[in-house]
Structure formats: structure tokens, C-alpha cells
Amino acid sequence: MRTKFGVMVAALGLFCVVAPAVAHHGFDTEYDANKKFKHSGVVKAVLWTNPHMRVHVDVTDASGKVTTYNMEITSPNSVQRQGWGRNSLLPGEKVVFEGYGGKVDESRGSLLSIAKADAPNKPLFVQGGPEAVQQGFPGAR
């Protein structure tokens, strides 16, 4: 009886740890794969925070309205393995970026790639997967 109880407690404990981890890392809990976009804008801030970095980019539409896109990236460690340093992307720089918009707010998104406007075909960052491997980024799988 003690063994069964111990197994049940261990299973419940494992579930309590795994469920939040899966929910936290689930792309579709916050972002919409049907809201892919590509914009150009000016970097407002680069936040080197764990567990995920953020890049804020000001995008000006045709009417002159400025929207700040709050884009999530992977961890600082992962972007450093792709060759980023703290001076790779600075506030005030013009960029071209692609991402997926948020389910509630498109301007809070998941960053797919970002490049400086004067070198749009040389991204500084590509979010994992085949694109990163194809671009030859260190640490890409």
C-alpha cells in the first residue's frame, strides 16, 4: 500500500511540474501561426533578460502612426551562440523583422528573424529550425 501511495504522490508531483513547463513553452498558447508578418522599423530597446529576450521595434504605418512591436526571442545564451553580442543590435538602428503576432495583440509577437535594414539578406538572428541551419548559424539544429 505504501508503494502505491508513493508512486501516486510521485506521479502527481511530476504532473505538477511538467504541465506548467509545457504550457510555458507552448507557442500556440500566446502566438498565432496564421498571423505571420514582415515589417521594417527602428529598434527602441533590446532586453537581455532570462528566460527570453525581447526586442522592441517602432513601426510607422502609412498614416504616420507608430506601433511598438514587443518581440520575444529565445534566451540570451541561444542568441550568443548565433553570434550576437550586446552591441550587435542597438536602439536607433533600422531593421527588417519577421514574426508571428500574438493571439490578442499582433504587436506582441514571436520573432522569427531580424536583420539590419542595410543588409536585409544577412539576418542577425533566425529562430531555430531549418532556416537557421540553412543560414549557417552556429548552434542551430
Regions found by a protein language model. Give the residues of each.
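Conserved hydrophobic positions within beta-strands
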Residues: 39-43
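Short boundary/loop segments of OB/S1/cold-shock single-stranded nucleic-acid-binding domains
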Residues: 23-37
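Short aromatic-glycine-enriched beta-strand elements
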Residues: 49-59
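OB-fold/S1-family single-stranded nucleic acid-binding modules
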Residues: 102-128
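Short, structured beta-strand/loop micro-motifs enriched in basic residues and often containing a Trp
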Residues: 73-81
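Bacterial N-terminal signal peptides that target proteins for export
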Residues: 1-10
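Short nucleic-acid-contacting surface segments enriched for D/E, G, S/T with interspersed K/R
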Residues: 81-97
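Bacterial N-terminal signal peptides
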Residues: 9-18
